[in-house]
Amino acid sequence: MKFIVEREHLLKPLQQVSSPLGGRPTLPILGNLLLQVTEGSLLLTGTDLEMEMVARVALSQPHEPGATTVPARKFFDI
């Protein structure tokens, strides 16, 4: 998976999907965000098992499709 996105386009959606991830999760994976690259967009998903937030960010550069999870706090700090 490979994609390029400007930080300014990513910041607001990242804040939205990170909101249900506050505090220390009971399961470590719940502190991560799911990143999915498909058809010209990046999908960001965050959940605490009770609430799920999904945001879409348009990608203007060519990309390679794929999916992975990343620690939400570290990704947001970058």
Swiss-Prot record:
<protein>
    <recommendedName>
        <fullName>Beta sliding clamp</fullName>
    </recommendedName>
</protein>
<dbReference type="Pfam" id="PF00712">
    <property type="entry name" value="DNA_pol3_beta"/>
</dbReference>
<comment type="function">
    <text>Confers DNA tethering and processivity to DNA polymerases and other proteins. Acts as a clamp, forming a ring around DNA (a reaction catalyzed by the clamp-loading complex) which diffuses in an ATP-independent manner freely and bidirectionally along dsDNA. Initially characterized for its ability to contact the catalytic subunit of DNA polymerase III (Pol III), a complex, multichain enzyme responsible for most of the replicative synthesis in bacteria; Pol III exhibits 3'-5' exonuclease proofreading activity.</text>
</comment>
<dbReference type="GO" id="GO:0003677">
    <property type="term" value="F:DNA binding"/>
</dbReference>
<dbReference type="GO" id="GO:0005737">
    <property type="term" value="C:cytoplasm"/>
</dbReference>
<keyword id="KW-0235">DNA replication</keyword>
<keyword id="KW-0548">Nucleotidyltransferase</keyword>
<keyword id="KW-0963">Cytoplasm</keyword>
<keyword id="KW-0239">DNA-directed DNA polymerase</keyword>
<dbReference type="GO" id="GO:0009360">
    <property type="term" value="C:DNA polymerase III complex"/>
</dbReference>
<dbReference type="InterPro" id="IPR022634">
    <property type="entry name" value="DNA_polIII_beta_N"/>
</dbReference>
<dbReference type="GO" id="GO:0008408">
    <property type="term" value="F:3'-5' exonuclease activity"/>
</dbReference>
<comment type="subunit">
    <text>Forms a ring-shaped head-to-tail homodimer around DNA which binds and tethers DNA polymerases and other proteins to the DNA. The DNA replisome complex has a single clamp-loading complex (3 tau and 1 each of delta, delta', psi and chi subunits) which binds 3 Pol III cores (1 core on the leading strand and 2 on the lagging strand) each with a beta sliding clamp dimer. Additional proteins in the replisome are other copies of gamma, psi and chi, Ssb, DNA helicase and RNA primase.</text>
</comment>
<dbReference type="InterPro" id="IPR046938">
    <property type="entry name" value="DNA_clamp_sf"/>
</dbReference>
<keyword id="KW-0238">DNA-binding</keyword>
<dbReference type="GO" id="GO:0003887">
    <property type="term" value="F:DNA-directed DNA polymerase activity"/>
</dbReference>
<dbReference type="InterPro" id="IPR001001">
    <property type="entry name" value="DNA_polIII_beta"/>
</dbReference>
<keyword id="KW-0808">Transferase</keyword>
<comment type="similarity">
    <text>Belongs to the beta sliding clamp family.</text>
</comment>
<dbReference type="GO" id="GO:0006271">
    <property type="term" value="P:DNA strand elongation involved in DNA replication"/>
</dbReference>
